[in-house]
Amino acid sequence: MSWLTPELTEILITVGKAIVILLVVVTCGAFMSMGERRLLGLFQGRYGPNRVGWGGSLQLVADMIKMFFKEDWVPNFTDKVIFTLAPMIAFTSMLIAFAIVPITPTWGVADLNIGILFFLMMAGLAVYAVLFAGWASNNKYSLLGAVRASAQTVSYEVFIGLSLMGVVAQAGSFNMRDIVDSQEHLWNVIPQFFGFITFAIAGVAVCHRHPFDQPEAEQEIADGYHIEYSGMKFGLFFVGEYIGIVTVSALMVTLFFGGWHGPILPPFVWFALKTGFFMMMFILIRASLPRPRYDQVMSFGWKVCLPITLLNLLATAAVILYNA
């Protein structure tokens, strides 16, 4: 076909890869919700969901049908435009953040020279979704949850950024593929161990996952900024949270554990196995740890995480200058 030029073919292939990768991420986020319930049941000596389909295999389908047919109710006292916009921002910001993650040497959505900065920007955008939801709901518990979430997320994003600067300094680039290539012989988790620990803790906090789920603590503030949401709007918040877990897990693999590098197995298999391991760790943390007070969470961040990241960055700079 005369209109199908090599340039157009390359564009179509790139767009096709992007669509496939993002659909897989959404699917992983959805399946993780079911896998989490099964694993929590295993950890706690329960059966978990096992009634729908063989061994509970169709539970996710049943949940999707239930959510589709639930009334998507918008209370009269809300700011309807902002109330509707908030879950869309929460979902898309975490999904777009995954775009900079290289899965294999040839598969990825966007190869940006400012990859890490792009992730930090998308993570910051997710704060607006929480603020919009809390303010537009016109509910005291929702607003309190939004204030908690914004303060917690902004604080721990500082520690995420500082923990990644050591990796950037070692690789000499913000590009994610360059960072993966720099780990061909030695994973960053060894020279940047304290940076990894801080990134892992801050990643859990930014995802609002247990034990850092104070913004939506059911026992304290009745699910926080989610309180007035139902139907598919709540579903976007729900799936967006799990997409955030997938994204943070993939970033840990890419930045600290060599990305797709590994012996014998194909690159995609190594990337999937490493990412799946960290997704399981999110679930194990939820099953194992209690929820601290909100002031303890903020105090831990500024009094423990910040000094560790600064010392790690200073040590990295000293080593680089010494080797130079």
UniProtKB/Swiss-Prot annotation:
**EC number(s)?**
7.1.1.-
One Gene Ontology molecular-function label: oxidoreductase activity, acting on NAD(P)H, quinone or similar compound as acceptor
User: What is catalysed by this protein?
Assistant: a quinone + NADH + 5 H(+)(in) = a quinol + NAD(+) + 4 H(+)(out)
Transmembrane helix is among the record's keywords: yes
PROSITE patterns, alphabetically?
A: COMPLEX1_ND1_1, COMPLEX1_ND1_2
What does the entry list under GO cellular component?
plasma membrane
Q: One GO BP annotation here? A: aerobic respiration
Is Protein biosynthesis set as a keyword in this record?
A: no
How this chain sits in the membrane, per its record, is: Multi-pass membrane protein
Q: Which UniProt keywords apply?
A: Cell inner membrane, Cell membrane, Membrane, NAD, Quinone, Translocase, Transmembrane, Transmembrane helix, Ubiquinone
The EC category is: translocase
Pfam families for this protein: NADHdh
Q: Which residue spans traverse the membrane?
A: 11-31, 81-101, 114-134, 154-174, 186-206, 237-257, 264-284, 304-324
Locations listed in the record? Cell inner membrane
NCBIfam families given in the database record: PRK06076.1-1, PRK06076.1-2
Supply the HAMAP family for this chain: NDH1_NuoH
The protein in question is named NADH-quinone oxidoreductase subunit H
Give the source lineage, highest ranks first: Bacteria, Pseudomonadati, Pseudomonadota, Gammaproteobacteria, Enterobacterales
**Gene that this polypeptide is encoded by:** nuoH
